[in-house]
Amino acid sequence: MTKDREIRQTVPAQPTSDGDGVKIQRIAGFQRPNFSPFLMLDELKADSQADYIGGFPPHPHRGIETLTYMLQGHFQHRDQMGNVGELRSGGAQWMAAGHGVIHSEMPIMQEGQLHGFQIWINQPARNKMSPAKYQDFQPESIVERHHPQQGLLRVIAGSVEVEDQTITGPLTDTGVPATVVDWRAEAGQDISINTPPHFNAMLYVYRGSLNVGKQSVKTGHMAMLTAGEQLTLRAEQPCGSLLLMGQPIDEPVVHYGPFVMNSMAEIEQAIRDYNAGHFETY
């Protein structure tokens, strides 16, 4: 008998700012075992130019992957490896920091609403000192599934299975298997998604409200889900949500600012390497 995933806990996003004053809603899970392999979800949402125009000036990372997904907006990525990429409405970009990267994400847009997400994904110890990587995914490369009763699925990373159909997104190079899906639906539409039972899973609602089984999740809340082989969602009203699933990493997590390693000694080494200018040479 198929075991349905249910809500273990609902976590509200907390308002804060990052970069040069960009307004965000944040859910951090650095020390939550059922959050792994994910570390943090930031919802970037601002109606006023003043709340995003400063962007994210050059800053370092080591030991993580970042996946940025834009619902509405236009930003540019630059890094010390020479990569330049544009992130447009409906598109995504992924970066594996490995042993070190310095990058910026700055707005090209001069007006209009900003709405998107940045997800931090942990790198397993074996990858934390690997060369950095970068990929961008234009809106047309995001794989979509439209269904009149089940709404719209946009698969950004990994694979998802619905009614024996497997849909694979453009990002498949994460250090451990991970899936990120945007599900949008009108009131009354529902969907059942098969989920790998060994994956952790969580669902963030960014618009409207929906039910996981018989439990409701409202805008701005993350539902941490129990283990199971199937996830059933039903839209209470027009809604948008982000489903994150991934293989947990059973390793120590030590977080300091933009660095995530396995020990404090490794964090201290990252700080020394950055201060010595080594990141610029990677």
Curated annotation (Swiss-Prot):
Residues 1-21 are annotated as: Disordered. Keywords: Dioxygenase, Metal-binding, Oxidoreductase. The keyword Metal-binding applies. Binds 1 divalent metal cation. It is an enzyme of class 1 (oxidoreductase). Putative quercetin 2,3-dioxygenase. This is Putative quercetin 2,3-dioxygenase VC_A0969. It comes from Vibrio cholerae serotype O1 (strain ATCC 39315 / El Tor Inaba N16961).
